[in-house]
Amino acid sequence: EGQKLEVENGSTLSLGNHNLTFVFAPMVHWPEVMVTYDSTDKVLFSADGFGKFGALDVEEDWDDEARRYFIGIVGKYGAQVQRLLKVAATLDIQIICPLHGPVLTENLGHYISLYDTWSSYTPEEEGIVVAYTSVYGHTKEAVNQFVEKLKSKGCPKVVVYDLARDDMSQALSDAFRYSKLVLATTTYNAGIYPFMNDFITRLAEHNFQNRTVGLIENGSWAPLAAKVMKNMLSECKKINWLDTTVKIMSAVNQENRDQMEAMASELCKEYIAKNDELANKNDMTALFRIGYGLYVVTSI
């Protein structure tokens, strides 16, 4: 009674049938975090790693709530997670026991692969998230028109969030899930509308990077939203800013529609190219579009 054993990184402890190895994993997601590996049953006790939101008695897909958990809880510390994954790769792991969520016993490669994707800030899927706020409905109308343009150009996935009404944590999760993000908001007190301000702050806090980003701004006199949004994301790494910015003066006009058309084309150029290539492969009439100089040789 009263005895304690202080372990260090790499320390081992024999419990008779079980042998434990302790591995420090600072900032995943607390400074003092360590994980424990039981070499007998090949179990990794992963602390906050591989956790998820949700009740254990609810049958649901692991990926969505685990992604939302990762981005919200651990997402800022991708480099630290990458270091932990390198250690995990040296172990024979057959069971993962996180502090939050179900025990993982099958298809562990799937979970580890997702953690590698998330912690390296690599887009998980091709697609476009459009996150917006609207005061009088004009920005919402612009977003609706813009989304239709994206869909018509073959974008494989378009996800839209009204940040004043939808789940902010889900919007944040999807911003990291997909490859491209469009932000649309109004100028507000020489800044941006509060819900958009909150959303972009969360993006920056969680190390948002390696994405293509486009901006749609609205304002009655002197729109500043695009400038403010870009400044807020200025410290984020590997952001590919679209050449086109949509600048709306209160309500959408033809110039704005042309700008949205240009932005949609810029976002969807690779999708358009893929669709054209597929269409050409499936076009049987192409067999008959043969240039001059073709001779038909027959034998008698």
Can you say where each PLM-predicted feature lies in the sequence?
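FMN-binding flavodoxin-like domain, especially the glycine-rich phosphate-binding loop
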Residues: L56-I96, H100-V103, Q145-Y161, A171-E277
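Short gly/ser/thr-rich secondary-structure transition/capping motifs
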Residues: Q3, A25-M27, S113, V160-D166
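Catalytic core of the metallo-beta-lactamase
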Residues: G2-E60
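Short N-terminal or domain-adjacent regulatory/targeting segments
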Residues: C97-E124
